Amino acid sequence: MHVHTIDCDYMDAPGVAAAYLLVDGDEAAFVETCTSRSVPRLLAALESAGLTPEQVRYVVITHIHLDHAGGAGALMAVCPHATLLAHPKAAPHAVDPTRIVAGASEVYGADRFEELYGTITPVPAARVRALDDGDEVPFGSGVLRFVHTRGHANHHFVVVAPQADAVFTGDAFGIVYPALQDAGLFAFPSTSPTDFDPAAAHAAVDAILATGMGRAFPTHFGEQRDLTGMATQLHELLDAHAAILEQADADGLEGEALDAFCQARVRSAFDSKVQAAGLEHHPDLGLLDLDVDLNAQGVAFALAKRRYKRSKARG
């Protein structure tokens, strides 16, 4: 099986978000779609591989976040024989993306949403298949296996392709921007809202290592071969994020004070990692700004969820 990495040019930036084209014999599958604006790039990669949209058997989304699944409906519309494969909690949102669109539009504003994501097209329910943990589907000379991986999102799975010695990890095995690898491996977790769970995120990293695959393909970004090194860096920074959450809880922080604390502490954790890697003056360091902000939001949201559950338990 051959794996082709497609740079989706997300946010008009190279090396930020990828989709993957899997080719085995006369069958093709896409893992991730990025946004509807990325679909021409995916189809161009398919043509370059000597295949047609009619030969696409599967379109796979690791989770429903729009930089991963926003183009699923548009891609399915031009791949007439494809089945969309999704986590059971993600599949309903592919069929009816109303809530996802409303939430993202509220965050970004209508104009910015349109600029980033274009039109989100529903996928007919009859063409969507939900995969349970451990499920397999036939593909080419082998199978694709699905492993549920909470921590980043409750509707997340990773895709194991043993015939390619590969696991496609979405956001469950961190972010590795190619532009920041000059001084060696620089990987970090995504703890964005609304499902960040430190313990589950640690477990997801371990589950990915346990697949035994020699190559990981995170959506952000590209083929990685040092899975053990990635896991070490991810566990370290997950511990740092968990410590921020615990300190904020112990200090009773809430509202703007909680948000400011999380932003400052997450920024400090990233700054320490940047300094240790010798990247303080790297021209592409601004790539991290959005991730720092989202990670801090995720920590604050996780604490709010914890407190809500506590209050419910007390009655």
What residues fall within each predicted segment?
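Conserved beta-strand hairpin/beta-sheet module of binuclear metal-dependent hydrolase folds
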Residues: 1-49, 159-171, 175
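Active-site/pore-lining binding-face segments in mid-to-C-terminal subdomains
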Residues: 199, 204-265
